[in-house]
UniProtKB/Swiss-Prot annotation:
Stretches with biased composition (Low complexity): 310-335
PTM-bearing positions, type Phosphoserine: 110, 163, 167-168, 187, 430
MF (Gene Ontology): DNA-binding transcription activator activity, RNA polymerase II-specific; DNA-binding transcription factor activity, RNA polymerase II-specific; RNA polymerase II cis-regulatory region sequence-specific DNA binding
Annotated region described as Disordered, given as residue ranges: 159-199, 303-371
Native source organism of the sequence: Bos taurus (Bovine)
Subcellular location, record wording: Nucleus
Keyword DNA-binding listed: yes
Its job: Transcription factor that activates the LYN and BLK promoters.
GO biological process terms on file: cell differentiation; negative regulation of T cell receptor signaling pathway; regulation of cytokine production; regulation of transcription by RNA polymerase II
Chain positions with Phosphothreonine modification: 190
Biased composition (Basic residues): 173-182
Descriptive protein name: ETS-related transcription factor Elf-1
InterPro entries per UniProt: Ets_dom, ETS_fam, TF_Elf_N, WH-like_DNA-bd_sf, WH_DNA-bd_sf
UniProt keyword list: Activator, DNA-binding, Nucleus, Phosphoprotein, Transcription, Transcription regulation
Amino acid sequence: MAAVVQQNDLVFEFASNVMEDEQQLGDPAIFPAVIVEHVPGADILNSYAGLACVEEPNDMITESSLDVAEEEIIDEDEDDITLTVEASCHNGDETIETIEAAEALLNMDSPGPMLDEKRMNNSIFSSSEDDMVVAPVTHVSVTLDGIPEVMETQHVQETYAHSPGPSSPEQPKRKKGRKTKPPRPDSPTTTPNISVKKKNKDGKGNTIYLWEFLLALLQDKATCPKYIKWTQREKGIFKLVDSKAVSRLWGKHKNKPDMNYETMGRALRYYYQRGILAKVEGQRLVYQFKDMPKDLIYIDDEDPSCSIESSDPSLSSTATSSRNPASRSRASSSPGIKGGATTVLKPGNSKAAKPKDPMEPVQPSEALRTVQSTQAPYPTQLFRTIHVVQPVQAVPEAEAASSMPEETLNPSVPSIRTIQTPAQVPVVVSPGNQHLHTVTLQTVPITTVIASADPSSAAGSQKFILQAIPSSQPMTVLKENVVLQSQKPGSPPSIVLSPAHVQQVLTSSVPTVCNGTVSAASAPSFSATTPMVTFSHHSSQLVAHPPGTVITSVIKAQEAKTHIQEEVKKEVEDNEKQGTEDAEQQLQPYVMVVSNGFPSQAAIKNELLEPSSF
């Protein structure tokens, strides 16, 4: 364009040039073809370019003479980016075509390869780094010659350069090494303490060899002298008492369950060449250590603790627990009685009795018996009492057979146990855990306790209350002879216990008995220090003989005669007079005191007393 000084000439020159340019724009051979690609969706476009495009309708351009059209694109980061499209054409159709071409160029991919790679990583993988990259600012302009120009400015935050990208070099993989084996147990049986632990010559770990294993067994109470023992300790000679068990333990230690003595013997013969072991000539399963360590633990054969059984189930045998004869409580029942069964007392640690135990006779149901132990009781031992009473029916002596189950009572168990058997006698085992010296046993007819019970069925039933009285309470002598009388024909006479060196003691706080009931005013308060047991007889006949137990007093209450007579008359129909006398003598409530810790000398004599003697 030539420079003209006058302004009019300059304007004319510019207008002529514009006309020439319009003619050139009409020729399609001047410009290359523009390819417009349709994007599948607006969501993909937004995520691909990192921009939120606000589509405006074509009505925004109201005047065809406008030279500039502006379109706003709002970014996600609230940054306004203005794309300016400049058109020099005054014709409306040409302006629209130019704007469409500019929009097509705007939608096309950017020419920068680095920008394409970053856009691809951010849009396809939808990583969290999209928020860190600011979308580029694109300016599209059409020059006077009709050639559109695209100018794109890229702004990348500094944090993106420092952030690790997916193209970062991967960390080197770790080499897979050998898995470490778990440490083996020190001993095959319940991991005993092994005092001898030697390393091999190379100093690699604490592997236990067979000769060290045998030394460990010789120092273990669970295996010595049960499986292996010393024969000559000073010379280091030992014997495999149970070669199969030793080989089995060695196989368990080596994790070889099929180990036997032949395989283990080959390893022992290997030690002959090494000078560690030697075979004793002429003796089977006898070996000798050449060098003996000085810090060995020797176990004597006479030590009772050496016979502890191994915890290995393959080597376990029948367990035998030590039983204290003074702490045994025996009970006898008659297996021949109809409807009866043998009673076995089974606490937590009880063991079944052996059949070779001696058999003891049984007293009939109307007799009260206490058997004295031949051994002196221990100072801390307390009473264990089983009371047998059957006032109405007498069991023939021919049917009385005894079976003696044993039990070992643990003082840590609860202080009272009640065992019921299928027939008609109460059983109470009371292992005391307090230093008590006196027990009060009181009988109360069931008819006075349960008013709605049938008198004919409840006349022979009684309720027994066993109360332990501490020795610290004051004592009062009431009666010297203890009498339990039975006048029914065919029944044995009563047993009278006359202690020689024992004074009959009874606490002054014993509740008074009136018509078979306990008066609430004078009844003592039962607490944890004064245990009490209430039981009724519905089982077979049993007799107990705790060591050092003496019955010191039996007292009858005369107030209950009339009431009991009326109850028994309904039951006994064949002999009304005889049944009434039996009820007066047998069903009257009485109080019995059992004391322990006194000299166990008592004379038993048969004596018939009249009711007036009480």
